[in-house]
Amino acid sequence: MHNSSMTSTLSQDDAEIQSPRPHSDVVEVYSAGLVIPITAPSVLDGAIAVSGGRIEHVGSRDWVIHALEQAGCPFVEHHVDGVLMPGLVNAHTHLQYTGMAQVGARRYTGFPSWAQAFDAVYDHTEFDWSAEAARGARLSIRYGTTSAADVVTDPEAASALHDLGLHGVAYWEVMGWSNEDWAARGPASVNASLDAMPTPPQIGISPHAPYSLDAEPLLDLPDLARRRNLRLHIHLGESHSEAEWKEGRTAQLDDLWRSGASTSFTEMRSLGGGFSATQFVDQLGVLGPDCHVAHGVYMTADDRRRLRSRNTAVALCPRSNRVIGLDAPPVAAYLNEGNLLAVGTDSLSSSPSLDVMEDVALLYKIARAQGYGEGDLARRLLHTATLGGAVALGLSTGRQRVGQLQSGAVADMVFFDVPVTTIVDTIEELVQTGASRQIATIIDGSLRWVDPRFSDFFEGDVQ
């Protein structure tokens, strides 16, 4: 058994990822000063027993070891004095844009100025999308992410999660289709792209946004996904243009549908429709428990109600919103009203890093600034970064469940170098300062990344 406590200061480029190793007959016991299962009470001096890539036992260290000894199971223990919790779920990212960090390193005045900077790099730079997506996947593992919602725009980037052994969903992004082009060849094109994507993990469809697709593809894509038993993921409420008009509304959504002037969200807006993008996609049947949305910044109380009614989760990406120059998402309202929440980093083209805990810390500050004063904030935000993300990706139940530490679940975990005091105070410290303090990432029970200064703590003798 080993222990230590030192702060990691590794840079993004130090992500040396280990290959998955074959499962052995020896049970691995991972113990820590505090274990946070998410689906059960946190345990001081806790432990997780792992066998065959799955969790066997969760509880106090003494109980877990006693249970293994009583069963005559050989085991090896790895102990760190910090925190052990489920692997993080990055519920919205674009790993292929890892090479566009120069765009995300700046600040912008709104969506148009950011899009101009993005297009200037995307259109005039030769990228190896496969290599960049793989690098993004490695960085994700370094930051404790074990599952991701990866939006794929170029087919070369489609295999990043598959190749690196990450869980989650790779979503094929669909954008720029007019009604006419879609009718001629859209469904066949999308189906062919989906058929070419490797599995596992799961694949899904990402209709980019209400403003980047005409109405017919937005109407058809949910049906196409559901016939194939695929999940959906859409950017929604990210730009000012998607917000409901507070004044000057001249036409209601139902009126415009009946008039036949419903070729696209943009066209209907130009004809005086003051409805929100959320109302628009809800009318088209996009939302549902098999769909989650990214950003959700410009959402009225009615928009948030619609998301709750459809059991649709929101992946909040506050650092991306800040870089682009958008408002902060209504975090306090989401929490008070009971919306399903997850956390995403977005891509390095609009965010400083792929560390989900950076976004968690910012969400904490935003919620407090917006008046959320309850003492459960830190605990709830840890939930959004783990089980909340699993719910958003459809991975919270069943044999492949993630985002939780419980018997039978996939053994995806992350260690943090955070000093352990009381349970409440340690969780507060983890949420507010846990970014870049990851020690080790375990996927399917296999050690995939470890801070080199802690590497010997993950070796041990069989007992």
Regions from the language model: what does each represent?
Residues 2-29, 35-85:
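Histidine-rich, glycine-flanked metal-binding segment
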Residues 73-75, 156-164, 186-313, 325-341:
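Histidine/acidic residue-rich metal-binding segments in metalloenzymes
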Residues 94, 153-154, 173-177, 208-210, ...:
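Active-site beta-loop-alpha junctions enriched in small/polar residues
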Residues 99-131, 169-175, 240-288, 363-370:
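Active-site gating loops and adjacent loop-to-helix segments of metal-dependent hydrolytic enzymes
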Residues 283-286, 329-420:
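His/Asp/Glu-enriched, well-ordered alpha-helical/loop segment
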Residues 407-463:
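C-terminal cap of metal-dependent C-N hydrolases
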